[in-house]
Curated annotation (Swiss-Prot):
Domain of life: Bacteria
Keyword line: DNA-directed RNA polymerase, Nucleotidyltransferase, Transcription, Transferase
Higher taxonomy: Bacteria, Thermotogati, Deinococcota, Deinococci, Deinococcales
Name of the featured protein: DNA-directed RNA polymerase subunit omega
Family designation: Belongs to the RNA polymerase subunit omega family.
Assembly: The RNAP catalytic core consists of 2 alpha, 1 beta, 1 beta' and 1 omega subunit. When a sigma factor is associated with the core the holoenzyme is formed, which can initiate transcription.
Gene Ontology BP, a term: DNA-templated transcription
PANTHER family from the UniProt entry: DNA-DIRECTED RNA POLYMERASE SUBUNIT OMEGA
MF term (GO), any: DNA binding
Amino acid sequence: MAEKDIDKLLSLTDSKYRLSVVIAKRALQLRSGAPSVLPVEQRVRTRNLVTQAMRELATGKLTVGTGLMDENRFHQDYVRQKQAQLQAQLNAERERERD
C-alpha cells in the first residue's frame, strides 16, 4: 500500500498497535470466509488478506469498532452457515439415492 494510505489508516485509530490488531482480525475473518465489503471493481488483486483488510479499512467500508464482528459471534455464524451447507448436501445426496 502507498504511504498515504498507511497514514490514513493510522489516523483512524488511537495507536498503531490497535490498527494492527484490527487489520489482523479482519484478515482472519476474510480467511474464514467472510465476504469482502468492497465492490468487485475495488477489490485488491492479491491473495494477501492483510492487504485486502487494509484496503477495506482505508476506503471507509469498515470503521474501527463498528464494522468488525465480535470474534465469537462471527465464528458461530460461520459454523451455522457451514452446517446448513453440509445439511443441504446431505439432503441432496439422500434425494438422489431415493430416485
